[in-house]
Amino acid sequence: MGAFSEKQESLVKSSWEAFKQNVPHHSAVFYTLILEKAPAAQNMFSFLSNGVDPNNPKLKAHAEKVFKMTVDSAVQLRAKGEVVLADPTLGSVHVQKGVLDPHFLVVKEALLKTFKEAVGDKWNDELGNAWEVAYDELAAAIKKAMGSA
C-alpha cells in the first residue's frame, strides 16, 4: 500500500468530527444500511435483536467503536504505514460471530454512505478514498487476526 498522506489523515479526522455531531442518528443510518444489504447480519449483533434503535446505547457504542477504529487506522497508516489492532481479540470475536469476507464489503459500503450523509456537500472522491483506504487496511488487519484465531 502506498503512503497515507497527511491530507488523507486530516480528511478522515475532520469528517469524524462531523459524525460525532449526531452519533445516534449516524449510528442508526449505519446499521440500517448494513441490514438492508445483509438482513442476516442482524443475528451477529445482539443489540439489533429488536431492530435498529438510535436510542440503544449499545448500538451507538458499537458504531462509534467501528468508526473510531477506522480513524485510528488512518492515524496509524500515516504514522507507520500499517495498521496494528489495539484489541488482539478482534479476530476471534469476528470468527465466533461468523463474519465472512463479504461482510467486510457490506460494512465498508455502509460506512462510506454514512459518512457521505454526515458531511453532506463536503463529500468528495478524495474524502471517500481516504476513508476507503483506512477501512480496507483495518479490515485486512482483522482478517489476518481471524486467520490466526
Curated annotation (Swiss-Prot):
Q: Which PANTHER family match?
A: LEGHEMOGLOBIN-RELATED, NON-SYMBIOTIC HEMOGLOBIN 2
GO-annotated cellular components: cytosol; nucleus
SUPFAM superfamilies in UniProt: Globin-like
Is Iron among this UniProt entry's keywords? Answer: yes
- In the record, Nitrated tyrosine modifications are located at 31, 135
Q: Which InterPro entries match?
A: Globin (IPR000971), Globin-like_sf (IPR009050), Globin/Proto (IPR012292), Leghaemoglobin-like (IPR001032), Leghaemoglobin_Fe_BS (IPR019824)
Main location per the UniProt record = cytoplasm
Q: Which UniProt keywords apply?
A: Cytoplasm, Heme, Iron, Metal-binding, Nitration, Nitrogen fixation, Nodulation, Nucleus, Oxygen transport, Phosphoprotein, Transport
User: Under what name is this protein listed?
Assistant: Leghemoglobin
Q: Which residues belong to any copy of the Globin domain?
A: 3-147
Compartments it resides in: Cytoplasm, Cytosol; Nucleus
Task: Describe how it is modified after translation.
Answer: Nitrated in effective nodules and particularly in hypoxic conditions; this mechanism may play a protective role in the symbiosis by buffering toxic peroxynitrite NO(2)(-). Nitration level decrease during nodule senescence. Phosphorylation at Ser-46 disrupts the molecular environment of its porphyrin ring oxygen binding pocket, thus leading to a reduced oxygen consumption and to the delivery of oxygen O(2) to symbiosomes.
Residues bound to O2 are 62
Q: Which residues carry this modification: Phosphoserine?
A: 46
* Segment forming the signal sequence: none
- Binding-site residues, heme b: 46, 65, 94, 97
Assembly and binders: Monomer.
Family assignment? Belongs to the plant globin family.
Q: Does the keyword Metal-binding apply?
A: yes
State the protein's purpose. Answer: Leghemoglobin that reversibly binds oxygen O(2) through a pentacoordinated heme iron. In root nodules, facilitates the diffusion of oxygen to the bacteroids while preventing the bacterial nitrogenase from being inactivated by buffering dioxygen, nitric oxide and carbon monoxide, and promoting the formation of reactive oxygen species (ROS, e.g. H(2)O(2)). This role is essential for symbiotic nitrogen fixation (SNF).
The organs and tissues expressing this protein are described as: Root nodules.
Q: Which GO terms describe its biological process?
A: nodulation
